[in-house]
Amino acid sequence: GLRLSEEKTVITHINDGFDFLGWNLRKFKGKLIIKPSHKSMKKITRKISEIIKENQTATQEILIKKINEVTVGWANYHHSSCAKKCFHTLDHRIWEMLWRWSKRRHPNKNKHWIVNKYWKEHKGRKWTFMSDKNILFLMMDMPIVRKGQISLNKNPFLDREYFECRAKRHRLNRKRAMNSNRAAQMGYYAL
């Protein structure tokens, strides 16, 4: 039969919450709230920090490409949860790391020179870390997608059209997510 691991199994109240697969699940004011766990946020922050440290002498183009590979995938994984505040927090942490990276590269230049070299105005945002070809993906631009509930009065055997339509929508959303992830891995994030 099924055996539960003693060290991995935790019994907790839903109001206290628990972490599972990078998410924190908790009931708050009668509603189930699912958001990225603190452990998951620390892990991606550490990973991006390592990328920046490993690429201290790399061009801005290469750095943007490597960071986008990680952030687009992470944002796609968490975009169906309550992640907007987490996305904003991580974008701010990445901005701070990139500011330190740019100051280390040019210790004798003033901040205005550094800003003009690495940050440009793009779509109304003055502080966009971008090169001539690439732009840093901001997780807060990722739309939060709420999953629709299945209608309880539908029968999968009788209402085939309803379930086929749901499946088609699901396939299209997965394809869109895969394409945006693939583009980021290739270093293309549209300007």
Feature locations, PLM:
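Non-catalytic terminal/accessory segments
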Residues: G1-L191
